[in-house]
Swiss-Prot record:
Functional summary from the UniProt entry: The beta subunit is responsible for the synthesis of L-tryptophan from indole and L-serine.
SUPFAM superfamilies attached to this UniProt entry: Tryptophan synthase beta subunit-like PLP-dependent enzymes
Molecular-function GO term, any one: tryptophan synthase activity
Catalytic reaction(s) noted: (1S,2R)-1-C-(indol-3-yl)glycerol 3-phosphate + L-serine = D-glyceraldehyde 3-phosphate + L-tryptophan + H2O
Cofactor: pyridoxal 5'-phosphate
Recorded superkingdom: Bacteria
Keywords: Amino-acid biosynthesis, Aromatic amino acid biosynthesis, Lyase, Pyridoxal phosphate, Tryptophan biosynthesis
Name the record gives this protein: Tryptophan synthase beta chain
Pathway field: Amino-acid biosynthesis; L-tryptophan biosynthesis; L-tryptophan from chorismate: step 5/5
InterPro entries documented for this protein: Trp_synth_b_CS (IPR006653), Trp_synth_beta (IPR006654), Trp_synth_beta/beta-like (IPR023026), TrpB-like_PALP (IPR001926), TrpB-like_PALP_sf (IPR036052)
Modified residues (N6-(pyridoxal phosphate)lysine): 84
Length: 394
């Protein structure tokens, strides 16, 4: 593990963090090669998270769109309502193994914060979550969930008051409390070894989906579609298909109010190579290399960077990345709810929206898998507000 995907990745961190990061790499490698650790992890995935999650044939949607067969990988059915617990559980288990008494995490939509607080409660560790002040407001329900689970939530008032600033605050805390604290990063980002750790704990999604589609259809899918913020749900489903050249991988970013406006989070579509949060990757930045704010209706996608392995897949042309606007995502949110009785997270709705455009252009014997990364309970308020604003002609 040299921590590079082509030129992307690396460890752009202060000297004070290098020891902790090196220790983490050593301990992680020991853990994943330790049968006892992996058995314990798999036990909790099955009995606590509720894996495996179904691969569901979306018959109504398929008929209605009149093209490819659409399958949904139901990560929304995991305990805590998204794919996030796959990773939080693995990392908190690792923290416990390393003898750390306290875990910290950053969170945007609040899903990773809830997942980390959940795992910390399960394994008896102290938990503190950093969240941008704006996200605290947007995701009040998740903030309360974290507090119920015994976590302390810090509202971060700096920069844009969103995920990027929460990560900065969490990294500062980690530097200060390195001896007793483990930093649970929520996506395939940050300095090496984090992108690999998170990918290894999320690839269960794609491993299951690959087996399930072979069982259901006797062959691999033509397309796998997933939303991309930092990129962990997408990397989790993409990774086991990377070697299958016939499977097209499509990551869907947030186009916000449009990629030709400054109000979007389409890092791979509109960004350029730079350094953020300890890694070299695509970032949204100005001519001077200053990070520009990311925006999306979905709190989980408004990140101005992206996991380095996604940057690598883009450059190698192994995956392609598209962008979907707030409006299209909101439409897809309602569409899936009405057609299949499944309320998706606004993040996942971006993937659904792209698949709604893709499927009708394909033949009836082609297969599309959408990673439904989370459920939409947390977003009902946001959607309600948007519908009211549209009614009032805003």
């Amino acid at each position: 593990m040299n921590g590079r995907f082509g030129k992307f990745g690396g460890q752009y961190v202060p000297e004070t963090l290098m020891n902790a990061i090196n220790e983490l790499e050593v301990e992680f490698n020991k853990a994943i090669n330790d049968e006892k650790f992996m058995m314990e992890y798999k036990y909790y995935l099955e009995k606590y998270v509720g894996r495996e999650t179904p691969l569901y044939f979306a018959e109504n949607m398929t008929k209605n769109l009149g093209g490819a067969k659409i399958y949904l990988k139901r990560e929304d059915l995991n305990h805590t309502g998204s794919h996030k617990l796959n990773n939080a559980l693995g990392q908190v288990l690792l923290a416990k193994r390393m003898g750390k008494k306290r875990v910290i995490a950053e969170t945007g939509a609040g899903q990773h914060g809830v997942a980390t607080a959940t795992a910390a409660a399960l394994f008896g560790l102290e938990c503190e979550v950093f969240m941008g002040a704006e996200d605290v407001e947007r995701q009040a329900l998740n903030v309360f969930r974290m507090k119920i689970l015994g976590a302390k939530v810090n509202s971060v008032k700096s920069g844009t008051n969103t995920l990027k600033d929460a990560i900065n605050a969490a990294m500062r805390d980690w530097v200060t409390n390195i001896d007793n604290t483990y930093y649970v990063i929520g996506s395939v980002m940050g300095p090496h070894p984090y992108p690999t750790i998170v990918k290894d704990f999320q690839k269960i999604i794609g491993e299951e989906a690959r087996k399930q589609i072979l069982k259901a259809e006797g062959r691999l899918p033509d397309y796998v579609v997933a939303c991309v913020g930092g990129g962990s749900n997408s990397m989790g489903i993409f990774y086991p298909f990377i070697k299958d050249e016939g499977v097209k991988l499509i990551g869907v970013e947030a186009a916000g109010l449009g990629i030709d406006t400054p109000m979007h989070a389409a890092t791979l579509t509109k960004g350029s190579v730079g350094i953020i949060h300890g890694m070299m990757t695509y970032v949204l930045q100005d001519e001077d290399g200053q990070i520009t704010p990311a925006y999306s209706v979905s709190a989980g996608l408004d990140y101005p960077g992206v996991g380095p392995q996604h940057s690598y897949l883009k450059e190698k042309e192994r995956a392609s990345y598209e962008a979907v606007t707030d409006k299209e995502a909101l439409k897809a949110f309602l569409y899936l709810s009405e057609k299949e009785g499944i309320i998706p997270a606004l993040e996942s709705s971006h993937a659904v929206a792209y698949a709604m455009k893709l499927a009708p252009s394909l033949s009836k014997d082609e297969i599309v898998i959408i990673n439904l990364s989370g459920r939409g309970d947390k977003d009902v308020n946001t959607v309600m507000k948007n519908m009211e604003e549209n009614k009032n002609g805003k």
